[in-house]
């Protein structure tokens, strides 16, 4: 062999332990697999680099009703925009006594609020909730408020 410095691995070929001691040394998973020992022999590492990894916080609420106040709202001034301009013009042209039915729940709204003004035209509005103002304005225009479940 040339006088290039030998690497350690080449030197250790042919020796059983290859520089790792006697029986059972340098084998398999001496510290356990994965996150094993986080509460025990790897405690220092977990406390230093992953604080709060173990344990519970706070209390659970078994009967929590997350969406019980979910109530998408729309104002009166936007009410006819749900029907559409062409439908509104068609109703104006006919001058019929038929009142269109607007079901707010189908459009994804639950509550009707009273901001804005309504055209002096009867309309039947179905919703889960009405504000007092909205109800008064609809009745003033000759319409009806229907509560839907």
From Swiss-Prot:
Extract one GO molecular function annotation from the record.
Answer: structural constituent of ribosome
Q: Which Pfam families match?
A: Ribosomal_L27A
Q: Where in this protein does the record put region Disordered?
A: 1-37
Q: Does the keyword Lipid biosynthesis apply?
A: no
* GO cellular component terms listed in the entry, alphabetical order: cytosolic large ribosomal subunit; cytosolic ribosome
Is the keyword Cytoplasm assigned to this protein? no
Name its GO BP terms in alphabetical order: cytoplasmic translation
Give the Basic residues compositional bias ranges: 1-31
| Alphabetically ordered keywords of this record | Ribonucleoprotein, Ribosomal protein
- Annotated S-S bridges: none
Its family remark reads: Belongs to the universal ribosomal protein uL15 family.
- The protein in question is named Large ribosomal subunit protein uL15
């Amino acid at each position: 062999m040339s006088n290039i410095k030998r690497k350690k691995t080449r030197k250790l070929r042919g020796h059983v332990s290859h520089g790792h001691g006697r029986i059972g040394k340098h084998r398999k998973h001496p510290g356990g697999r994965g996150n094993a020992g986080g509460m025990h022999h790897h405690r220092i590492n977990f406390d230093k680099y992953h604080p709060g990894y173990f344990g519970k916080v706070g209390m659970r609420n078994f009967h929590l009703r997350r969406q019980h106040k979910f109530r998408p709202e729309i104002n009166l001034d936007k009410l006819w925009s749900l029907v559409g301009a062409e439908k509104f013009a068609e109703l104006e042209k006919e001058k019929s006594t038929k009142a269109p039915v607007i079901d707010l729940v189908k459009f994804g709204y639950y509550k009707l609020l009273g901001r804005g003004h309504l055209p002096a035209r009867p309309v039947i509005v179905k919703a889960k909730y009405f504000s007092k103002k909205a109800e008064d304005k609809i009745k003033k225009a000759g319409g009806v408020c229907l509560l839907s479940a």
